Amino acid sequence: MMRRLAVLSLHTSPLVQPGQGDSGGMNVYVRELVSALAQAGVQADVFTRRWDEASPEVVEVEPGFRVVHVEAGPHDLAKEHLPEVVDAFADGVHKHLEQLGDVDALHANYWLSGVAGHRLKHELDLPLVSTFHTLARVKAETGDPEPERRVRAEAQVIGCSDAILASCGAEADQLERLYGADPGRIELVPPGVDHAFFSPGDRAGARAALRHLRLGDGPVLLFVGRIQPLKGLDVAVRALAALQRPDATLVVVGGASGAEGAEEVARIAALVDDLGLTAQVRMADPQPHHMLSTYYRAADVCVVPSRSESFGLVALEAAACGTPVVAAAVGGLRTLVVDGRTGFLVEGRDPEVFAARVDAILRDDALAAAFGTEAARRGKGYTWSTAAARLRRVYSDLTTRALVDCQ
């Protein structure tokens, strides 16, 4: 029986608001999944690198769920330099785990945590569960290559993990095809959504709550995510131009992220200006997660033009709110968006095609309503309690079998 879990989240904390810096869907994933596990009786400590000297060493989020801040390098260290502090992070986690003494398994999130988890597995003789969230070789296929060091590290962690979590069948296929992962160790555990917040609601009321954005009476397109090239905001902006609807508004919720974030924000601002869309684009700062439901409800269509997406939590949250989604046909978005039933999938990155799909929804109220109803119905099948139940079975199984040897 699983008693206590050590969750590794080196580069980003579940306490940080998603949508800014390196905080995004992974923050939501770790926070919501660990919360659901705690409510199901599995205690968990989430270990993350201290990024703010004012943060206490231990924060109790709720009974059974704590966040432990580990000293590992300068607090303002850029993400590209985090590989240099993995060993210091692992040292700090090791010290805490020796004091706890009753940890049953490690669960690493993202490749950096996986490297630390790989070391700790051997030092502490504990099973290692890995969730990668993004994969270097998948990003390389979209023209966004990562350093070879990351590729090698991911391959090593995949070879040594006792269980590898995939959010959807597409990610499982990528793990097998690109990394030779043992299919017997891949576990399909889709994330969930908090239906207490993300559910259909009154569009007029939502727009009234966002009156500061001056949305007007025309259609509203929504983009939610960190502003970085991977997320494809430029496609959404160009699609707005191609739509040729002066009464349409594109709302962008998110902030600069990663080494290219500031440059991408400037590039998007210049693109908006060049296309003459300044009056039609509204930029909103990253929002507290539960507040995003108001934005989803206010929108006619949510646009998700990512270059790659292991799962696509934004698409799921929009669906749960009954908002049709037009998304790139990549990764987990192929699973979340049922083409022609809950929205549209777009092959390739042609803004004209995105615009045509958005226009089809805007021009047909009956189609939009049908998409929204079916999206909300399907969204109900994704809950964090279900994800936690699946994960508990994975953890329990690991406690009864020998550890996987490194390959």
Which residue ranges define each predicted feature?
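Short hydrophobic beta-strand element within catalytic cores of glycosyltransferases
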Residues: 324-327, 337
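N-terminal subdomain of nucleotide-sugar transferases
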Residues: 1-69, 407
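A short helix/loop element that forms part of the nucleotide-sugar donor recognition site in Leloir-type
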Residues: 200-215, 220
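Conserved donor-binding/catalytic core segment of Leloir-type glycosyltransferases
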Residues: 215-231, 237-240, 251
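Short alpha-helical donor nucleotide-sugar binding micro-motif in glycosyltransferases
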Residues: 286, 294-299
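Conserved acidic donor-binding segment of nucleotide-sugar-dependent glycosyltransferases
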Residues: 339-340, 344-351, 360-365
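Carbohydrate-associated surface elements
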Residues: 170, 192
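Aromatic "clamp/platform" in nucleotide-sugar-dependent glycosyltransferases that forms part
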Residues: 307
